[in-house]
Amino acid sequence: MQARYSVSSPNSLGVVPYLGGEQSYYRAAAAAAGGGYTAMPAPMSVYSHPAHAEQYPGGMARAYGPYTPQPQPKDMVKPPYSYIALITMAIQNAPDKKITLNGIYQFIMDRFPFYRDNKQGWQNSIRHNLSLNECFVKVPRDDKKPGKGSYWTLDPDSYNMFENGSFLRRRRRFKKKDAVKDKEEKDRLHLKEPPPPGRQPPPAPPEQADGNAPGPQPPPVRIQDIKTENGTCPSPPQPLSPAAALGSGSAAAVPKIESPDSSSSSLSSGSSPPGSLPSARPLSLDGADSAPPPPAPSAPPPHHSQGFSVDNIMTSLRGSPQSAAAELSSGLLASAAASSRAGIAPPLALGAYSPGQSSLYSSPCSQTSSAGSSGGGGGGAGAAGGAGGAGTYHCNLQAMSLYAAGERGGHLQGAPGGAGGSAVDDPLPDYSLPPVTSSSSSSLSHGGGGGGGGGGQEAGHHPAAHQGRLTSWYLNQAGGDLGHLASAAAAAAAAGYPGQQQNFHSVREMFESQRIGLNNSPVNGNSSCQMAFPSSQSLYRTSGAFVYDCSKF
């Protein structure tokens, strides 16, 4: 195959290696055509023509030809070394580790062709670096050797100027003062190293610290001991006055925030420290899928005056984590009812029970949430917080929840004042976990508790009046298209103020058909929230949505 090419001129020789891939290509094509080498297409004759090779630039042909290659353009690129590195190279390559200025110039030009041009510029920089850097020491010339100019050498302390001998990385600018200080420090270290007892005292302070540590360390241990005592010896909840109930709720918030176990400020005061709360969260979320809803804790009629205490929550969390959610909501409902009956301002009640909750509201929805909190009880803020707590609900959903609250307000005129006050939303920050689990339950014990009758308080008065409506609403929306309105339905029962109704006429028309379907639903008389949804069905498609938990109330 090679014999077919004419090798008369060296230029054509330079082109032949360039065709290495195309030779095999054309050879395979000719063999496939069945014509053998005689059927070579025209391009081969073009490439083998010596006159055609002359069209290539001379430099390219010479690069492949037998001539000695000229300096490549890459040789004209400036080397990545600083002038200090270049001078150091020249000095270290000298036989006596000292070299004259002209010797430095010659070494640089021999090693790097880039510096063969523009000598005046870079040689001036070399002189500046020699005189300005303390690492280069000028040695006077002795008279024995002919020539002129002093020698330049490196300071003995500057040999470690470059990291690992690489001239590309210099540690820092060498200074004589720093070198002297380093020497002194090394001498001190050498003096301190021989006596080993000198190193023993440092371990002593940790022992002393351990001796003193029982002061700061016991509080977590004592707190846990108290929890276990409360868990093993549950004390009955003591009825308190409304003001005392609110005081205990707010007082319980302070040690939790200060306790070392509490690391998140977004937990409401009703939440236990994270040390024991995670044991309740996954159990109540995952257990709600497979296990039937647990029976509700008994809610006696004097539950309205019952105070919310840490003992209550700790015993419930220790006893049965699944029923802890319902008892948590009932305890919060009691304290919320107490605060609303005591006539305390709703923002105060909301702030006392959810200290870090205001930071969860998105800025566009702040007006709606503030209006709801000042509207009546904590219900408005509860509805707004339920919509905006996770940061994924928009203002229109808050409007829907407030509309639903205003629409449902008429059914609750006989209910105790603001029984479902801010309790609908208070447990929600504890359970509004960012990942969407497959359970279609988890917050229905709270939303449904407040919606279906204030978590046991209203259930005593209207066991089936509103509960069935909530259940039918929730079941009608099980298709998933309007599943995001479950929070609105949960907040619907909690508000006792129809004043918000006038602001949402357009939204009301949207839900008119749904409202008519609710009253005629066969599930109306059902007083429980037993819903069996498939575990794979997810109510929410957003990332930080609420998940709903079913439990009896």
Curated annotation (Swiss-Prot):
Effect of S241A: Decreased protein stability. No effect on transcriptional activity
Source organism: Homo sapiens
Mutagenesis / variant outcome for changing L86A: Decreased nuclear localization. No effect on DNA-binding activity. Decreased transcriptional activity
Amino acid composition bias (Polar residues), ranges on this chain: 356-368
Gene Ontology MF terms in the entry: DNA binding; DNA binding, bending; DNA-binding transcription activator activity, RNA polymerase II-specific; DNA-binding transcription factor activity; DNA-binding transcription factor activity, RNA polymerase II-specific; DNA-binding transcription factor binding; promoter-specific chromatin binding; RNA polymerase II cis-regulatory region sequence-specific DNA binding
Entry GO terms, CC: chromatin; cytosol; heterochromatin; nucleoplasm; nucleus
DNA-binding segment(s): 77-168
Record-listed Phosphoserine modification sites: S235, S241, S272, S320, S521
Full protein name: Forkhead box protein C1
Entry comment describing in which tissues the protein is expressed: Expressed in keratinocytes of epidermis and hair follicle. Expressed strongly in microvascular invasion (MVI) formation, basal-like breast cancer (BLBC) and hepatocellular tumors. Expressed in breast cancers (at protein level). Expressed in hematopoietic cells.
Ranges annotated as biased composition (Low complexity): 241-253, 260-285
Phylogenetic classification of the source organism: Eukaryota, Metazoa, Chordata, Craniata, Vertebrata
